[in-house]
Amino acid sequence: LECTIIENIKNFNLENRINVIYSDALEVKYSSMDSIEDGIMVLDIGPKTVELFSKYIIGSKTVFWNGPVGVSEFKNFEYGTKNICEVLKKSGADVIIGGGDSAAAAIRFGYKDDFAHISTGGGASLEFIEKQSLTALNAIEE
């Protein structure tokens, strides 16, 4: 089926009729939160915030991380997440990552073997921390 669709597209010369909107780069600007104008989308944390978060991470025995701190899928906005991964690695804490985006980022940046546990189940991880049980496991046990 896929080959048929592709062949039909080629036969109708749709490549020249279909248009897309794209961006080859997003401009990176640094600002403090109090000077962000309405309508501006914040996409990552900056160096000062990484430094601030690091103060809380260093010396912790256990860190549970759920959610990247920026849109780390884009190279221009991976700074915060990548640097938090490095701080977590160096902290010596037992680090538990919960959530698909955080897990994917840690693995993409080469940290998959540096943390105690990585789970793609963000909501399930939070549920387990809150309730000390998981709905799926409870159903199996019954």
Which role fits each region the language model picked out?
Residues L1-E142:
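Conserved catalytic alpha/beta core of Sir2/sirtuin-type deacylases, generalized to analogous enzyme cores
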